Amino acid sequence: MSFTGRPRITLALFMLAVLGALAPGAGTRAQNAASPTVYTIELVVFRNMSGSGGPEDWGAKAVARGPESPEQPVVTGRFVQSIPAAQFQLNDVAAKLQNTSNYQPIAHFAWQQTASTWGSRAGFTVAKLAGSVPGLSGIIYLERGSYLHLGMSLNYQTSNPPSGLAAPPGTVFNLTESHRVRFRTLSYFDHPAYGVIALVTPGNAATGGR
């Protein structure tokens, strides 16, 4: 099964059951010298309605993996274009989530860009990539060194967190992670309050990444 990430146990079981058959076949590894410089990135952000992760210190800020300082010279990724919904590749994943009672999509968007330098954390805001998504903000970045990494530092605020999280209304939940990614392989970014399923594929600006 083409799926990467470090999901919590309860959500991992759900993802294995629901998404396993939907994951695209593994493709070329991102570190291949012949890899294209334009990438298509598609994300489905969904809310965990169950609160099964339990209470935590919601004020704690995680630190994404990566070097203490970026590789030199520093290159900032270039935004190429947004991808229209008609060309989304994760519609089946979003539909599966929508049909559950515990995991509800709150955003689904895709775009093309070139990669930033590994360790630079140079990316684009949710507002630029997805427009206005109630309660969701932050930065998403694609970095390339020896390998390709997708990272994000997201904040999600809701007036009615699941009771199991023991979080008061208006709590801001921070998700900060960076994963090594491979083409056409689903990646999962995990938080007790919400999660992100991501797909990175070689992009072609002339064909909308297909």
PLM region spans:
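Cleavable N-terminal signal peptides
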Residues: A17, A26-T28
